[in-house]
Amino acid sequence: MATVRAHAIHLIRTHIPRTWFTRSRLLAKIKPNRDFGLDGLDTRLAEIVQKERGFFIELGANDGVTQSNTLKLELFKGWKGVLIEPVPRVFARLKKNRSRQRNHLEMAACVSFDFDKDYVEIAFSNLMSTPLNID
């Protein structure tokens, strides 16, 4: 059985294009214990939060898969929510990777209510965005 599972994982990784959401769903069916979040945070959240069909808001959603703390809730517990990502090219990947039928996707930066500028300039470096025009 382990050999069949390993072979299936190998086939998925080598023959299915890197459309993360499709590939991740297939891998998740074979390896349901796969962590998407950093250091298994998504798995711990799924264990603590027992509710089915809940609602989430993820600020800094990235591509919707990489270090996602909500994808596991969506795939295995039927959750839906709002995913917010400020970086345009990363947001484009988010739209491909996460279901718009289940979630609302928004390209926006989140700032405090007392932020007095018209826009936020952001520097993007891998998984971290840093605002540049905040005093």
Report residues per predicted region.
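Phosphate/nucleotide-binding beta-alpha loop and adjacent structural elements of enzyme active sites
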Residues: M1-D135
